[in-house]
Amino acid sequence: MARPSRDLAAAERFWVAGLGLTVLFRAEGGGEPGAHDLLMVGHPDASWHLELVHGGDHPVDPRPTDEDLLVLYLDGPVPQELVDRLLDHGGTRVASPNPYWNEWGVTVEDPDGYRLVLCRRGWSNS
């Protein structure tokens, strides 16, 4: 998933120090046409990552909506210490307009306003 970011350092604090993801790749764009700063975070053995971009010739401000959600299914209680760590690293706890997410999880906005849902339900694609 790729998203624009206003501040890659703030995004890194939230996703890495807050959520516990790993920096997989980082690049500074420099002054070349089409170049931008890039931060990729995720789990080293996962088949997905978040690609956060900033700057470039045509910078794009983040434009999240209340339904732009990244949902993590924890298959158990949402640890309060995880929520506290996300809040301590730039997150904001918010209520979801969808009552399902309020019943089954905790929603936290990242520094760019995108929403992360920590859901206590389980999920499997198999």
Residue ranges and their predicted role:
Residues 63-67, 99-100:
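Short glycine-enriched loop/turn motifs at secondary-structure junctions
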Residues 38-40, 71, 105-107:
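Short hydrophobic/aromatic beta-strand element in the GNAT-like acyltransferase core
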Residues 1-13, 25, 69-72, 119-126:
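N-terminal beta-strand motif that seeds the catalytic metal site of vicinal oxygen chelate
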Residues 44-49, 57-59, 76-80:
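Short, charged/polar surface micro-motifs in flexible loops or helix N-caps
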Residues 14, 78-85:
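Short amphipathic alpha-helices within nucleic acid-binding modules
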Residues 3, 83-126:
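Vicinal oxygen chelate
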Residues 3-47:
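Core segments of cupin and vicinal oxygen chelate
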